[in-house]
């Protein structure tokens, strides 16, 4: 406890004695609440626990019929994703003795469960905790001190631990016994060059600083012990490979398959916080991740992984990667010089489960994960750009290509400033092509409200601005040059002088007294049986088939 008091003293907190008692009580209450929660809720710390949880909630279907990992499994899963269907566990897969799990996080609700949350509303609470850690400010009041103290205490609880008899080492295969073709890898689209790994955690280490990076990258099968990797040049693993090349060293790599979905969410969160992904996962889950040392490389992996692939990348050794379906909804191009991974060891649990997913036009699992992350990012973005009241990354725009910002507009040009601040607030927003800015009273999650704001408040000559030749997603082939493209901002806010010299008209609204009277008399009109809460988009000309 003394470390926290020193922290508060450092920042000049005057009511240390009172704060200490309150903080200690807060932490003790937190620990008691966690113990109580253990009795009534499954703590998801590995994939099998999550599968059990989904089955208990009626959100899992076991498929015992023989299925083919070549196209068939993906087609079945795609139909589930389109309709928000249950997770699927294929127990009889052609050519492999391993089961295949897919669509585990096919809804935002299941993503929340994976993160030990019950409801999407709790995602912003988690985001507030991360915002405190991202840029801690000196506490000025007792409640602020408690909030910061609890956040720092959560960091201590989230520290990873070492497991010396990990489940992922129950079976060990080395040398000639390493055969990736025996794994039930999926080929998703008929034009894919080969089978792919999509939900493997790639763990690498900086050869100089020893900093570990955990990322999710698409791998493509090349031979029984080799794969190629597709990644962006800004990712952590690519920096590690460049440093290894400068030193003339191989880059050691571990691919953890079938991990706790919570860890996948942590690895998919590219937040600029000086925390490892393992610590991040511990913050997400409320307790530290159990790690195990690999057999042939100097890396650690989640101890409860279903499978682990251990290997190396030799700088300059490459293979032909692609084509393969990607998140843009098209086949990606062929990379003639993709980094080549050589694997010398496979470890796995007894009767391992292969967890997978696939990319493509939404809805896909990555889109559901992005919707959850959107809620987590919101408090962090508000901290960076306080005038942003809310923001939304629509799934149909690939979850990052278009952002809709609701701002508390205070002065002329405020919308443009908010857009520019958004693009630089977090690294992942660098690749957002379109930013639409609306007033704070606009429902940014209702496309009708957003389109109305654009149609009624935008003069294209005045309110649309373009930034040319900015860093861009190299997989976005809409640009003329790979890795370089433009960005567009659309100011759909109410205008004020000197943005306009014309009087801005007042929007139409129902008379509040009349609306209240109609609410009271609704049953008297004989209309109580009508359900006006659900909107049928077909009534407004939309075709949502």
Residue ranges with predicted function:
Residues 12, 19, 34-37:
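Short hydrophobic alpha-helical segments enriched in small aliphatic residues
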Residues 6-8, 30:
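Short hydrophobic targeting helices and cationic amphipathic motifs
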Residues 39-340, 344-545:
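Extended, highly charged
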Residues 23, 28-29, 33:
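Asparagine/serine/threonine-enriched low-complexity, disordered tracts
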Residues 9, 15-18, 24:
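Generic detector of N-terminal low-structure segments
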